[in-house]
C-alpha cells in the first residue's frame, strides 16, 4: 500500500485520470523538456558519485553481461514481433530497440521507489543503465540499415548517432561530473540535483500519465501483442 501511495505513482494516476476525462491539463512542452534534461543529468551525477565510492573491478562482469543482454533482448523482440505479422519492419525495429534499451525515467522511478522502501542496490546501476542503452541502439540501427539495404553505413555514423543522442550524452556527462567532483566536494548543487529530484520527477510523471491515457486507444490497433 505504501508503494501505491508514493507521490510519483499518484501524480501519474492524476495525469492519467485528467487525460481520460479530456481535461485541458498539460505540462508546458518547454518545461517538460527542461525536466527531462534535469532528470537525465541528475541520474548521471548520482551514478558518478556512487561509482566513485564503489570498487571498479566489481563493475566489469555486470557491464559485459549488460552489453550482451541489450543485443539479445533487441534481436529477440524483433524476432517475436516479426512472427506476429502485425507490424511493419520499421515499426518492429523501433519497438524492439525500445525493449532492448531502458527508459531513464523508468529507471529514476524504480530507484526512487527502492530508496523509499530502504532497499539497497549496487552503486554502479547508473553505469549499467548507459551500457544497456548503447548495444540496443546500435543493434536497432544495424537492423534498420540491413532492412533498408543500407548495411554499408559507416560505423562512425552509427557511433555518432548513439553517443551524441541527448540521453546518452547527458547521462555519460553526468557520470563524469559526478565521479570527478564526488559528493562531499560538491555540496553547493546537492539541493538542486538531489533534494528536488523527486519533485521534478512527480511533475514529469504527471505528463506521462496524460500521454499514456491518450495512447491507450492504440492498443485497439495492435491488440495485446505488445
State where each predicted segment sits.
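Alpha-helical transmembrane segments of multi-pass small-molecule/ion transporters
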Residues: 1-19, 26-30, 56-196, 200-208, ...
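A beta-strand-loop signature enriched in Asp, Gly, Thr, and Trp
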Residues: 211-226
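Active-site-flanking structural segment that lines cofactor/substrate pockets
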Residues: 41-56
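A generic structured-segment signal
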Residues: 25-26, 37, 51-52, 201-203, ...
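Metallocofactor- and cofactor-centric catalytic cores in central/energy metabolism, strongly enriched
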Residues: 34-36, 42
Amino acid at each position: 500500500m505504501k508503494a501505491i501511495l508514493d507521490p510519483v505513482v499518484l501524480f501519474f494516476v492524476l495525469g492519467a485520470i485528467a487525460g481520460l476525462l479530456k481535461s485541458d491539463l498539460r505540462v508546458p512542452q518547454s518545461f517538460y523538456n527542461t525536466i527531462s534534461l534535469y532528470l537525465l543529468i541528475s541520474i548521471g551525477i548520482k551514478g558518478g558519485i556512487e561509482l566513485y565510492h564503489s570498487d571498479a573491478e566489481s563493475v566489469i562482469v555486470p557491464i559485459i553481461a549488460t552489453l550482451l543482454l541489450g543485443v539479445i533482448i533487441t534481436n529477440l523482440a524483433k524476432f517475436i514481433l516479426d512472427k506476429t505479422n502485425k507490424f511493419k519492419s520499421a515499426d518492429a525495429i523501433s519497438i524492439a530497440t525500445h525493449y532492448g534499451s531502458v527508459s531513464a525515467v523508468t529507471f529514476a522511478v524504480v530507484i526512487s521507489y527502492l530508496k523509499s522502501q530502504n532497499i539497497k542496490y549496487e552503486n554502479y546501476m547508473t553505469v549499467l543503465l548507459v551500457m544497456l542503452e548503447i548495444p540496443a541502439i546500435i543493434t536497432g540501427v544495424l537492423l534498420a540499415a540491413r532492412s533498408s539495404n543500407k548495411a554499408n553505413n559507416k560505423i562512425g555514423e552509427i557511433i555518432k548517432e548513439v553517443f551524441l543522442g541527448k540521453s546518452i550524452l547527458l547521462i555519460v556527462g553526468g557520470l563524469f561530473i559526478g565521479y570527478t567532483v564526488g559528493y562531499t566536494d560538491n555540496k553547493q548543487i546537492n539541493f538542486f540535483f538531489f533534494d528536488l529530484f523527486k519533485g521534478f520527477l512527480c511533475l514529469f510523471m504527471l505528463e506521462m500519465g496524460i500521454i499514456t491515457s491518450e495512447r491507450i486507444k492504440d492498443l485497439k490497433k495492435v491488440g495485446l501483442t505488445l
